A protein has these predicted regions:
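Bacterial N-terminal signal peptides that target proteins for export
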Residues: 1-8
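C-terminal motif of bacterial Sec signal peptides marking the signal peptidase cleavage site
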Residues: 16-19
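Loop and turn regions of beta-sandwich accessory domains that flank beta-strands and are enriched
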Residues: 68, 130-232
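Surface-exposed interaction regions that form or flank ligand-binding interfaces
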Residues: 13
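Acidic/polar, low-complexity intrinsically disordered N-terminal segments immediately downstream
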Residues: 4, 21-145
Length: 232
């Protein structure tokens, strides 16, 4: 059994090494890529800028600087960011830096907006994958961002949830302006909401009018999942 385990690990290591060899460009190739990003979440605090430096790497080094043009896409408003139209890899180097600044302009606390940055390929240069930033408005220092998503079933009107400030005895956010059911009446799909919670003590409560289980629900604080259910 021990030999089998050893051989298995050796096989996995060789397979992983072979896989990496297939994905990495050979030295000297005219190829450039952004540093690895598997989605990047950006939260911009009120009245502040959020600078983000992104590294760009090439597979070769040349004696002259190289300028790579960029294309921007997504639904993030142009006033919400500053991005150069190109990035430069200096002479005698294989690394450049793209300086991006996200701004507190036309951001939404509930719905993330996206900005995708692409390097333009040319006959002289192959490029890697795009990078996409998910950008949202954050909260002031001392407050946490509460964000909730509720997937509605066939009877959306029977769901009522609220967050209660137990120190003040007050409802700070709910899916209905008046305590009670009906806030989601006529709606479908996934409904989202968010707010900023100052430091304090809070209780999340959810009610189902027919007590037969509502749709899936989850909520986070500052991006960290606190609760999730499958709707059962």
């Amino acid at each position: 059994m021990k030999k089998l385990k050893l051989y298995s690990l050796l096989f996995i290591a060789v397979a992983a090494f072979s896989s990496c060899e297939e994905e990495v460009e050979a030295p000297g190739t005219a190829y450039a890529s952004f540093e690895a990003y598997l989605g990047k979440d950006i939260t911009v605090s009120p009245n502040t800028d959020f600078p983000q430096a992104v590294k760009v790497y090439s597979a070769n080094i040349t004696g002259s600087a190289r300028t790579i043009d960029l294309t921007l896409s997504g639904n993030l408003d142009a006033s919400s960011y500053e991005v150069p139209t190109s990035v430069v890899i200096p002479a005698n180097s294989n690394e450049g830096t793209l300086n991006v600044v996200f701004k507190d302009q036309n951001l939404d606390i509930i719905t993330d907006k996206t900005l995708t940055i692409s390097m333009n390929e040319s006959a002289e240069l192959s490029v890697g994958e795009d990078i996409t930033f998910n950008v949202a408005k954050g909260c002031n220092a001392g407050s946490s961002k509460f964000k909730i998503a509720v997937s509605l079933d066939d009877w959306p009107e029977e769901v009522y949830w609220r967050v209660v400030d137990t120190d003040a005895g007050a409802i700070v956010i709910a899916n209905n302006a008046t305590p009670g059911y009906g806030g989601y009446a006529g709606l479908t799909g996934t409904q989202r909401d968010a707010t900023c919670l100052p430091t304090g003590n809070y209780v999340f409560e959810i009610f189902d009018g027919y007590e037969d289980g509502a749709g899936a629900l989850s909520f986070t604080l500052d991006g960290v999942q606190v609760f999730s259910s499958n709707g059962g």
